[in-house]
Design a protein with these regions (language model features):
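Glycine-rich beta-strand-turn "strand-cap" elements at beta-sheet edges
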Residues: 4-6, 16-35, 75-80, 110-135
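An amphipathic, aromatic/His-enriched active-site/gating alpha helix that lines ligand/cofactor pockets
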Residues: 5-8, 22, 58, 62-71, ...
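Short, well-ordered beta-strand segments in beta-rich or mixed alpha/beta enzyme
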Residues: 36-44, 74-101
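N-terminal targeting signals for Sec/Tat export/insertion, comprising classic cleavable signal peptides
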Residues: 36-66
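Non-catalytic surface loops within mature trypsin-like serine protease
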Residues: 45-47, 93, 126-129
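Short phosphate-engaging motifs
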Residues: 49, 83, 105
Length: 135
């Protein structure tokens, strides 16, 4: 299904109005390079499950950040809606992303949060260009 352009603009605008929930301790700071595989995910969480979801995604994100092919794993929370999350994951390749999805920590996250998520939309992307730089 093709989405209207305004829906894409809203998704992109999430970056402008989101706040980062938690940094990933010990996460490597690396540049995103053209060709990197991105998984961008919009999630609406059942309000009563927000704290449980945050604990589960933080555990998953911290483990993912240590994977060899993971360049970035950001957990963002919409400033105007505490139950709306946006995940921005960058991997060296689609194979690295698939390895993440096959990991035990991801399987645990998926099973734990299955009933916490009211709505989920995942958008696979590739980095075309980036102004991110390693520090």
């Amino acid at each position: 299904m093709i989405k209207p352009i305004w829906m894409s603009a809203i998704a992109i605008g999430v970056f402008a109005v989101c706040t980062i929930v938690l940094p990933m301790p010990g996460q490597r700071v690396v540049a995103q390079s053209a060709g990197s595989y991105v998984n961008a995910v919009d999630l609406d969480i059942v309000p009563a499950e927000r704290d449980n979801y945050l604990a589960a995604i933080t555990e998953n994100g911290m483990a993912a950040a240590k994977e060899p092919g993971c360049r970035r794993f950001d957990i963002l929370n919409l400033a105007s809606d505490p139950n709306h999350f946006f995940l921005y994951e960058v991997y060296d390749s689609e194979a690295a992303f698939q390895a993440h999805r096959a990991s035990e920590h991801f399987k645990k996250y998926a099973a734990t949060t299955a009933k916490m998520v009211a709505k989920r939309e995942s958008r696979p992307m590739t980095v075309t260009a980036s102004n991110s730089v390693a520090k």
